[in-house]
Structures are given as C-alpha cells and as structure tokens.
C-alpha cells in the first residue's frame, strides 16, 4: 500500500490564537466565526462553483499544533473528565495516528475578490492558521442520523458557567469595541464553556489563566462556579 502525501488547499482565519481557548465543538461559541482562504492553485472560482447553495460544510484539517510522536492506542476524552481511557478510534481526540480532524461548519458567504476566494463561516472550533486539506458540502439526508447512538457523548454538554468582568476588564473591552463590536460577548461565550482541561474542571483553584483571542490576552480565574474575567490586554506586535 502506498503512502499518501497531502498538501493544504486552504487555511482558516479564526479568533483563536492557541489551542487552549478553542471550543470543544464548532457550535458552542456563536461569535467565534472563521474565514477559510483558499490557497493557489485551488483559489479558482470554478473550484467553488455551486458551493453557495449549501448551508453547511465539512472541513478536513490538520491538528498542526499537536506534537507528533509515537501514537497511543487509548486516549482520555474530555467528556469523561480526562481520567477514563477509551480507544483512540472511539474518540475525537487530537492525538491520533494521522493528525486529521473533521469539523461541520455553517457557510454564510462565498467571496471571490481580487483573485482570492474566501469562505465566510459561522462558529468554528479551529486554531487560527489551521491547514485545511479538503472541503465537502454537508448533505442533510445522507449525513444526518437522528437516531444515532453516541456512547459517552450522547448527552449535551454541562450547564454553562456564570461570567463576570472586573471594572478594569470592562473598561479595557469598551475601549476596543469600535474595532471588535462583540468582543465582550465573545469573551463571555468562550469563558462560560470553561476552557480549562477536563481534569481541572469542577476543582477549586486560585490560579489565573490567560488565553489569546484576536489580538488580546484575556486573563481570568474561576471560583465557586463563576468565571471572573480579570484583565484584557492588547498584545503588542513585534516591531
């Protein structure tokens, strides 16, 4: 059997600058939208002809921020608290023999401008700059299975956490909402999902976490089931 070499056909632009803040599913953070940019020679209008007639897409992508090495036959899914093991092929874990992922996303617009092609998407669960290897239309009658059994992922995700902003964080966000109109709402949506690793969730801690969203470093802590957004700092670009 011959090995297969893949080349990216596109990259995706998202607000998530690191994997720590990425939601676990694409529909959890409504304001966390993305844009797929097709790369040459695949940025031809002919390649996306008719795509606008579909409301949703499948993206096949690379977990490019995962350190590659010897794969393990079992993994610890976050939905099981990060403590119970299942087979790697019975999970959607990022650490896989081949670092490929599959994501269903909403297609909002196909834009062809100045020789470039952009696919404007709804909520996504991918890190900024993630390589895309293929794009396929979601076909409802074939892809939807209402009676499917999903083992440990059958139930919906836990209740969202309450999010509060310090006065300092509120002030910082307000100053930047002309450029990022929904910044406060977006940060709230990310934090209420509890971005911490599964094994840390539900445990008391005074630790202050930080994550990069757009061009901001967002600092926060969790106490008694409430997320407190402590600080929002604009990240200085390298000169």
UniProtKB/Swiss-Prot annotation:
Please give the SUPFAM superfamilies that the UniProt record associates with this protein.
Answer: YaeB-like
Q: Which reaction does it catalyse?
A: N(6)-L-threonylcarbamoyladenosine(37) in tRNA + S-adenosyl-L-methionine = N(6)-methyl,N(6)-L-threonylcarbamoyladenosine(37) in tRNA + S-adenosyl-L-homocysteine + H(+)
Describe the location of the TsaA-like domain by residue ranges. Answer: 6-147
Question: Which Gene3D superfamilies does UniProt cross-reference here?
Answer: YaeB-like
Q: Which UniProt keywords apply?
A: Methyltransferase, RNA-binding, S-adenosyl-L-methionine, Transferase, tRNA processing
Question: What Pfam families does this protein map onto?
Answer: TrmO_C (PF18389), TrmO_N (PF01980)
GO MF terms, alphabetically ordered: tRNA (L-threonylcarbamoyladenosine(37)-C2) methyltransferase activity; tRNA binding
Q: Where does S-adenosyl-L-methionine bind?
A: 23-25, 64-65, 92, 102, 127-130
CDD domains cross-referenced by the UniProt entry: UPF0066 (cd09281)
Against InterPro entries, the record matches this protein to:
TrmO-like_N, TrmO_C, UPF0066_cons_site, YaeB-like, YaeB-like_sf, YaeB_N_sf
Gene Ontology biological process: tRNA methylation
Q: What is its EC number?
A: 2.1.1.-
Classification via PANTHER family: TRNA (ADENINE(37)-N6)-METHYLTRANSFERASE
What job does this protein perform? S-adenosyl-L-methionine-dependent methyltransferase responsible for the addition of the methyl group in the formation of N6-methyl-N6-threonylcarbamoyladenosine at position 37 (m(6)t(6)A37) of the tRNA anticodon loop of tRNA(Thr)(GGU). The methyl group of m(6)t(6)A37 appears to slightly improve the efficiency of the tRNA decoding ability. Binds to tRNA.
Q: Which family does the UniProt entry place this protein in?
A: Belongs to the tRNA methyltransferase O family.
Q: Quaternary form? A: Homodimer.
> What is this protein's record name?
tRNA (adenine(37)-N6)-methyltransferase
- Species of the source: Haemophilus influenzae (strain ATCC 51907 / DSM 11121 / KW20 / Rd)
Q: From the UniProt record, report the name of the gene that encodes this protein.
A: trmO
């Amino acid at each position: 059997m011959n090995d297969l070499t893949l080349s990216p056909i596109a990259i995706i632009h998202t607000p998530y600058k690191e994997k720590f803040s990425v939601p676990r599913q694409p529909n959890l953070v409504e304001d966390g939208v993305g844009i797929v940019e097709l790369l040459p020679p695949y940025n031809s209008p002919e390649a996306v002809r008719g795509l606008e007639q579909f409301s949703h897409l499948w993206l096949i992508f690379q977990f490019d921020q995962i350190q590659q090495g010897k794969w393990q036959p079992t993994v610890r899914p976050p939905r099981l608290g990060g403590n119970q093991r299942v087979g790697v092929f019975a999970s959607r874990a990022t650490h896989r023999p081949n670092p490929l992922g599959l994501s269903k996303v909403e297609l909002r617009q196909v834009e062809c401008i100045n020789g470039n092609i952009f696919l404007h998407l709804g909520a996504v669960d991918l890190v900024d700059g993630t390589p895309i290897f293929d794009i396929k239309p979601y076909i409802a009658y074939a892809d939807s299975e209402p009676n499917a059994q999903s083992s440990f992922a059958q139930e919906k995700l836990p209740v969202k956490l309450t999010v509060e902003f310090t006065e300092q964080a509120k002030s910082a966000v307000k100053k930047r909402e002309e450029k990022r109109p929904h910044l406060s709402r977006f940060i709230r949506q990310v934090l209420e999902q509890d971005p911490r690793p599964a094994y840390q969730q539900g445990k008391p801690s005074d630790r202050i976490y930080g994550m990069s969203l757009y061009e901001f470093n967002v600092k926060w802590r969790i106490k008694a089931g409430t997320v407190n957004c402590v600080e929002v700092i604009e990240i200085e670009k390298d000169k």
